[in-house]
Design a protein with these regions (language model features):
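Serine-hydrolase catalytic-loop signature spanning alpha/beta hydrolases and amidase-signature enzymes
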Residues: 91-101, 113
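Active-site loop/oxyanion-hole signature of alpha/beta-hydrolase fold enzymes
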Residues: 53-58, 65-80, 108, 114, ...
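Gly/Ala-rich beta-loop-alpha elbow adjacent to hydrolase catalytic centers
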Residues: 160-164, 168
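Alpha/beta-hydrolase active-site loop signature
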Residues: 93, 118-122, 189, 306, ...
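Flexible "cap/lid" subdomain of the alpha/beta-hydrolase fold that forms the substrate-access gate
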Residues: 2-45, 82-83, 134-142, 149-159, ...
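Catalytic histidine-centered segment of alpha/beta-hydrolase-like enzymes
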Residues: 332-346
């Protein structure tokens, strides 16, 4: 892992609308760094942070826990067994900072834990993605495999939330032998768009969707310019409540703003992977049967989430001779890991400990 200062000149300034209007959005790389430092401050265990170089001159921003001296278990034969690393992939519009309520718990038992800003998000490289959905998907997958090689991990427990769940599944399809367990938290992109969808969507929503189609999903946040931070606080005031046990101010909203007001990259890839209105071009339900039957899978849903949980049940039925579990966290919404962090942490630790 490289020093965090090494790529500052490579990243340059993040311009949110165009190179001739850099000051429209009140953000920059330094703002993002400061907001990330603030959101990670409550973590009391030691960790490293830095850029991991991958192919095509890109890099992945990574937090690492227990990398050098990880705890080990002694089996009844006296052979030392290292714990399998846990790797976390955030969802759309997220970043490493949103795991602040989970990282200390995950790393507390000595297990190597890594949290990544996915390619195109957070402090990772923001390259141009392919316009084809499959090309964009492959770029995400290859960046993860490049990162794994750079970190020297033979195997890992891969946990993905939302878009991170989709990318994790795509990775499992291509590199199943690298995974000990696939954990999908409220994963996006599994179900196909229902045929009845068009019938019940109001005309005004269809018109608005058509008008916004040329723009990236987070374009309005940038177009709002100096009002962007306030707009985010108003529209997503729920995040303050989700993290109220950790922060009394707008630390989380500030972090989310600076993560998403940077140059569009990962969100462009996401847009290229979708069809109206946010449904996947290539639903994972059509591909999941190809996943190795020997790979254990666990789906984690929130009981109050708007994400449909039928995909997990359907996949469980598809894999009658494979280990496929479904966990529902009571009282949690889409951001399960923030809404009910203690229950979520316990569930994930149990999965990890079963894999060593």
């Amino acid at each position: 892992m490289r020093n965090q200062e090494e790529f500052v000149l490579t990243e340059g300034r993040s311009w949110c609308i165009s190179s001739w209007l850099p000051s429209w959005c009140p953000t920059s790389l330094s703002h993002l760094i400061k907001s990330e430092d603030r959101i990670l401050k409550p973590i009391k265990v030691k960790f490293t942070q830095g850029y991991v170089p991958i192919s095509n001159g890109n890099y992945i921003w990574t937090l690492g826990f227990n990398e050098v001296e990880c705890s080990s278990d002694l089996s009844i034969t006296g052979v030392q067994q290292l714990k399998v690393p846990l790797v976390l992939l955030h969802g759309f519009g997220g970043g490493v900072g949103l795991w602040v309520k989970n990282l200390s718990a995950f790393a507390g038992e000595g297990r190597p834990v890594y949290a990544l800003d996915m390619l195109g998000f957070g402090r990772s490289s923001r390259p141009t993605f392919g316009r084809d959905a499959k090309d964009a998907e492959e770029q995400f997958v290859q960046s993860l495999e490049d990162w794994r090689k750079a970190e020297g991990l033979e195997h890992m427990i891969l946990l993905g939330h939302d878009l991170g769940g989709y990318v994790s599944t795509a990775y499992a399809l291509k590199y199943p032998h690298r995974l000990k367990h696939l954990v999908l938290v409220e994963p996006w992109g599994f179900a196909a768009r229902p045929n009845v969808q068009e019938r019940w969507i109001p005309i005004w929503i269809k018109a608005f969707g058509a008008a916004m189609n040329p723009f990236n999903p987070l374009g309005p946040l940038r177009l709002a310019g100096p009002l962007g931070p306030l707009l985010l606080q108003l529209l997503r005031s729920d995040f303050k409540q989700k993290y109220a046990s950790v922060f009394a101010d707008d630390t989380v909203a500030d972090y989310i703003y600076h993560v998403n007001a940077q140059t569009a990259s990962g969100e462009t890839a996401f847009k290229n992977m979708t069809i109206p209105y946010g449904w996947p071009q290539h639903p994972m339900m059509d591909q999941v049967e190809k996943i190795s039957p020997s790979l254990p899978m666990t789906f984690i849903y929130g009981s109050r989430s708007s994400i449909e949980g039928q995909s997990g049940k359907a996949i469980q039925e598809m894999r009658p001779n494979s280990q496929t579990k479904i966990i529902v966290i009571q009282g949690a919404g889409h951001y399960v890991f923030a809404d009910q962090s203690e229950d979520f942490n316990q569930a994930v630790l149990k999965i990890c400990n079963n894999e060593c």
